[in-house]
Design a protein with these regions (language model features):
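Conserved helix/coil segment N-terminal to the catalytic DExD/H
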Residues: 406-414, 420-441, 460
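A short hydrophobic beta-strand->loop->alpha-helix junction that borders the nucleotide-binding pocket
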Residues: 377-381, 404-406
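Phosphate/diphosphate-binding loops
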Residues: 256-260, 265-269, 448, 477-478, ...
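Conserved nucleotide-binding/hydrolysis micro-motifs of P-loop NTPases
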Residues: 240-242, 274-277, 381-383, 420-424, ...
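SF2 helicase catalytic motif II
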Residues: 434-472
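ATP-dependent helicase/translocase motor core
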Residues: 95-373, 382, 386-398, 410-414, ...
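Interdomain helical connector at the RecA1-RecA2 junction of SF1/SF2 helicase-like NTPases
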Residues: 483-545
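Amphipathic alpha-helical interface elements
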Residues: 1-135
């Protein structure tokens, strides 16, 4: 029975071994910055880690994490090929560690023939005892990792020398292996069925009349079908060493063939197994995404083709926003959205109604057919609670959920959350079938309260994961907004989508009353603040300003 399920447990063990290896690396390499959370996903996504690890190896360990999560959360069977891929990729990472930090490095090649194929008798009770001992060892290892910190300097020096004198060449993957190892797994993680009576994915799907040449055949790498039997999307796969955009022309030709056959043009993905691009040339622009989309999300996007309206003709509800500058902000965002821009920054002085403007924008985009699900992010639970209460007053007809205190309503139209809560929810929140609830295209609009550089630095993974329209809100004067915040929202000239500053609110709009300074003495003004005296939490808070 144990060997019958060996393929299912190998990914879990590989993931556990990878986690220990990654934590070891953090303990000895002082160039790595510890992320906010020390879970495996956060550790391998941290910017300095990505820059340190060999690019191909980093892509391979992402597969180990994904397959491990799939095995743990869904209970679905894992094939021998998938289990071997996970083991092979773990081997590549450990080999890279040896190459950089090992004392007696030897260039090795993964050899699956060394894995025993014959069944042998096992002592089940002995295995159970060993598993218990392993758990105890894990705790001991955690303690030993901390002792390694004093050796960081010597390890860093060894790494620099070893990389100059040693050779390391990770294996490239063929187009076929790319499909089997990485794209198939992404499809499974998004709930697609590749085989069986409920299969909704066709592989090497034949199309005719390529490039409008009668009888000329082509074979689509993947076609994703909806519940109505109509194609929702095509996937064009290329080797991992190739830019996924290389398959763009081929994907368009396949989509056009399917349009002639079915009367509707499917959306398109191009991918090399790691980097993926998506576009709907009927109603959207091409852009990178974290993975393929779920069936439900693709159907939503397909339906939206006929639902979208001209946003300039959608009346703004005066019951929500009746001030001219709030309406100007909404119109500015809507105009940019219709031009294909996906990131927007609103700079509005405190007290001028940022949350009210955000709810009115949500209302306009919803009635215009652009938005179904909304995510509102704030950095404190009190702000999340207040924002939900405000939205409830402004949009009483929409279902709302404060994810920080209520997991039951996570399918609500508008979800409110802190950044850490959402970071966990991305991988942990699942439906009865074990499929992810918060898929990459689940949210159509993401509102970021009090946008500042520390948020994008610490929680960048959230914004890279979700594919929705981003709207950042900040009260920081536009000239004081950090340059990298403008870069994040892709504004080259440090000019936001719309700005309504304090001076205008006081002197022109008379929305705010002026403030007056009263001079007082504090320890801060007299003695100053010294960074070394601050707690880590206070250092982070100070960094925001």
């Amino acid at each position: 029975m144990i060997f019958k399920k060996i393929n299912d447990v190998v990914p879990k063990w590989c993931r556990k071994a990878l986690e220990l290896a990654v934590k070891w690396l953090y303990s000895v390499d002082k160039s790595l910055e510890q992320p906010y959370k020390d879970n495996l996903q956060s550790l391998i996504s941290e910017k300095t880690f990505v820059q340190t690890v060999d690019p191909t190896v980093w892509l391979q360990i992402r597969y180990v994490v994904k397959l491990g999560n799939h095995a743990v959360h869904t209970g679905n069977q894992v094939s021998r090929e998938e289990a071997l891929s996970s083991l092979r990729n773990l081997f590549a990472f450990v080999q890279w560690l040896d190459y950089c930090y090992g004392a007696d490095y030897e260039e090795r090649t993964f050899d699956p023939s060394m894995i025993p194929t014959e069944k042998t008798s096992v002592d089940v009770e002995k295995i159970r005892k060993q598993e218990s001992l392993l758990q105890e060892k894990d705790a001991q290892i955690e303690g030993l990792l901390k002792q390694l910190e004093e050796l960081q300097g010597s390890f860093a020096q060894k790494k620099e020398t070893n990389q100059k004198t040693r050779h390391f060449a990770p294996n490239d993957l063929s187009e076929y292996a790319t499909r089997k190892q990485y794209i198939d797994l992404d499809l499974k993680l998004m709930g697609w069925k590749l085989e069986g009576p409920d299969a909704d994915v066709a592989v090497e799907y034949e199309v005719t009349d390529m490039e409008n040449k009668p009888g000329q055949k082509g074979y689509v790498d993947y076609v994703l079908f909806g519940k109505d039997g109509m194609p929702l999307a095509v996937i064009e796969a290329k080797r991992t060493s190739k830019d996924p955009k290389i398959g763009r022309k081929q994907a368009i030709l396949y989509a056009e063939c399917l349009e002639r056959k079915y009367g509707r043009k499917p959306m398109m993905f191009t991918t090399n197994g790691f980097d993926t691009n998506f576009w709907d040339d009927v109603s959207g622009t091409e852009h990178p995404v974290v993975s393929v989309f779920s069936k439900g999300d693709l159907q939503k996007l397909m339906d939206r083709r006929t639902m979208r309206k001209d946003l300039t003709k959608i009346q703004i509800d005066d019951k929500i926003t009746d001030r001219y500058y709030q309406k100007e902000a909404i119109r500015a965002v809507c105009e940019k959205i219709m031009m294909g821009k996906r990131k927007h920054l609103l700079v509005m002085a405190t007290g001028t109604g940022k949350t009210r403007t955000a709810s009115s924008l949500t209302d306009v985009l919803s009635r215009g057919g652009y938005v179904t699900n909304v995510l509102f992010l704030a950095d404190r639970t009190a702000l999340v609670k207040q924002a939900k209460e405000d939205f409830q007053n402004y949009l009483p007809g929409m279902s709302l959920c404060n994810l920080c205190i209520n997991k039951e309503d996570k399918n609500a139209r508008i979800v409110f959350s802190t950044y850490p809560t959402m970071l966990n929810a991305i991988t942990e929140e699942r439906n009865a079938e074990g499929d992810l609830i918060f898929t990459p295209a689940h949210f159509d609009l993401i509102i970021i309260d009090e946008s500042h550089r520390s948020i994008f630095k610490k929680y960048r993974a959230i914004f890279e994961y979700f594919d929705g329209i981003l709207v950042g809100l900040t009260a920081t004067p536009k000239d004081d907004v950090a340059h990298n915040t403008y870069n994040f929202f892709e504004y080259k000239n440090d000019i936001p989508t719309y700005a309504y500053d304090y001076h205008t609110a006081v002197e022109v709009g008379h929305v705010l009353v002026p403030f007056y300074n009263y001079e007082v003495k504090t320890d801060f003004t007299v003695k100053g603040i010294h960074n070394d005296d601050l707690s880590e939490k206070d250092k982070e808070r100070y960094e925001r300003f």
